[in-house]
A protein has these predicted regions:
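Conserved catalytic or regulatory cores that recognize and/or transform ribose-phosphate-containing ligands
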Residues: 1-152
Length: 152
């Protein structure tokens, strides 16, 4: 990695508040970080209630918003140098990686970008084979490796 590596954070919307904290920690280490558009909106408003942003559940006409958010983040991944997956516990499952983050990881993998995952991979995932096949760097909750790689 060259100095000035741009890290794109990928995460379930349920983890966006944590993602903002991780972003702040990486920025303090001199790393450029991009978070999803909804995470930026949550940070600006201070409202981290996911339901307030996922309006397509109530109004199917809003799925175009979901599509735009996905496309925008895919563009951010394409323009970044690596991704960091925030995979906290969700629905009682440690290391949760949902379908949207799997798609983002697949894009990064296809583009030969390093994939960092904050916590251990989920146990008994229906896509365990695919996750392991992307050869991610598992940080085990510690950002030091990512920071070191980004500063080289």
């Amino acid at each position: 990695m060259s100095k000035g590596m741009k890290v794109v954070i990928c995460s379930s919307a349920a983890f966006y508040e944590h993602a903002i904290g991780v972003k702040d920690e990486l920025v303090a280490a001199g790393i450029e970080v991009i978070v999803p558009k909804t995470a930026r909106a949550m940070e600006q408003s201070g409202n981290y209630e996911v339901e307030a942003y996922k309006t397509w559940y109530e109004n199917a006409d809003d799925y175009d918003k979901k599509a735009e958010l996905m496309r925008t983040h895919f563009d951010e991944i394409t323009n970044g140098d690596s991704i960091l997956v925030i995979n906290d516990e969700k629905h009682g499952k440690p290391g949760y990686i949902g379908p949207n983050v799997l798609m983002e990881m697949s894009l990064a993998w296809y583009q030969k970008k390093p994939i960092y995952i904050l916590n251990d991979l989920p146990k008994e995932s229906p896509f365990e084979e695919e996750l392991k096949g992307m050869m991610p760097v598992i940080l085990k909750g510690n950002l030091e490796r990512l920071i070191r790689d980004a500063q080289q």
